[in-house]
Amino acid sequence: MLTELALGLFALWIAIFSQALHKIEEGHVGVYYRGGALLKAVTNPGYHMHIPFLTTVKSVQVTLQTDEATNVPCGTSGGVLIYFDRIEVVNFLSQDSVYAIVKNYTVDYDRPLIFNKVHHEVNQFCSVHTLQEVYIDLFDKIDEEIKNALQEDLVKMAPGLYVQAVRVTKPKIPEAIRLNYEKMEAEKTKLLVAQETQKVVEKLAETERKKAVIEAEKAAQVALIHQKRLLSEKETEKLLNQMEAESNLASERSKADAEFYKAQKQADSNKILLTKEYLELQKIRAIASNNKIYYGDSIPQAFVMGTTQQTV
């Protein structure tokens, strides 16, 4: 009987102990409710004890987590209703702010602070923009707009809860509109391809033009060099001819000077040589060597006047 009682008490103790012992995983903290009231105790990861049946344990994540809002409606300013398949909000809760946020918003704080706020901000954004802006022009800014709006409100409503990033999928639009947009994108792509092709053609034409300019400049430079060479040859030839002419002129002048000098000297020599006595001597010699006989009245004058009249 005592043995059975002891075994029963031991089993009861084991059951109570197993209910009292709980584990908090890494990256989480434990919060406790007793009688529906939140206790101020916040426990770290590990094993802990609590009073079974009176105290309830809740685990709250304090590392990065991703909250996902699905099928979020978006009514544009033009009256077209579209849906975002999925909007992901990456956030984390500071351990020091766990008690205050859980007390104000329960352990499901992400429902009022993130999910509901995402729907509200999406509607606010879509209501002031057209379908074109939401679907194409401003789509890359939606995530940043939602992130900034969420963080601005969290600073006021739940300090310690931070939004790291927001990811937004492409919205679903009515099929007819989607097909029109696809056609429009296809035409835009064709236009871009045509523009790029035109740029390539223009680039090639510009390259050919530059090549032609370079070739023309090269030909002009070659022609200029050739012309300069010809001019240089002409100038050299002219200079050589001029030098040759000057040399010939100098030679002729030298010859003329020599002839003039010779004639001048001969004249001076003759002037010195042809004296009156010498001329008389030569005349006598000429008469003496002349075997012709002269007759007439003018014979004496031949010797006196030096005339050459004769009669045979």
From Swiss-Prot:
<feature type="topological domain" description="Lumenal">
    <location>
        <begin position="25"/>
        <end position="312"/>
    </location>
</feature>
<dbReference type="GO" id="GO:0031625">
    <property type="term" value="F:ubiquitin protein ligase binding"/>
</dbReference>
<comment type="subunit">
    <text>Seems to form a multimeric complex.</text>
</comment>
<feature type="glycosylation site" description="N-linked (GlcNAc...) asparagine">
    <location>
        <position position="104"/>
    </location>
</feature>
<feature type="topological domain" description="Cytoplasmic">
    <location>
        <begin position="1"/>
        <end position="3"/>
    </location>
</feature>
<keyword id="KW-0325">Glycoprotein</keyword>
<dbReference type="Pfam" id="PF01145">
    <property type="entry name" value="Band_7"/>
</dbReference>
<keyword id="KW-0735">Signal-anchor</keyword>
<dbReference type="GO" id="GO:0005789">
    <property type="term" value="C:endoplasmic reticulum membrane"/>
</dbReference>
<comment type="similarity">
    <text>Belongs to the band 7/mec-2 family.</text>
</comment>
<dbReference type="GO" id="GO:0015485">
    <property type="term" value="F:cholesterol binding"/>
</dbReference>
<keyword id="KW-1133">Transmembrane helix</keyword>
<keyword id="KW-0812">Transmembrane</keyword>
<dbReference type="GO" id="GO:0032991">
    <property type="term" value="C:protein-containing complex"/>
</dbReference>
<keyword id="KW-0472">Membrane</keyword>
<protein>
    <recommendedName>
        <fullName>Erlin</fullName>
    </recommendedName>
</protein>
<dbReference type="InterPro" id="IPR036013">
    <property type="entry name" value="Band_7/SPFH_dom_sf"/>
</dbReference>
<feature type="transmembrane region" description="Helical">
    <location>
        <begin position="4"/>
        <end position="24"/>
    </location>
</feature>
<dbReference type="GO" id="GO:0032933">
    <property type="term" value="P:SREBP signaling pathway"/>
</dbReference>
<dbReference type="InterPro" id="IPR033294">
    <property type="entry name" value="Erlin1/2"/>
</dbReference>
<keyword id="KW-0256">Endoplasmic reticulum</keyword>
<dbReference type="InterPro" id="IPR001107">
    <property type="entry name" value="Band_7"/>
</dbReference>
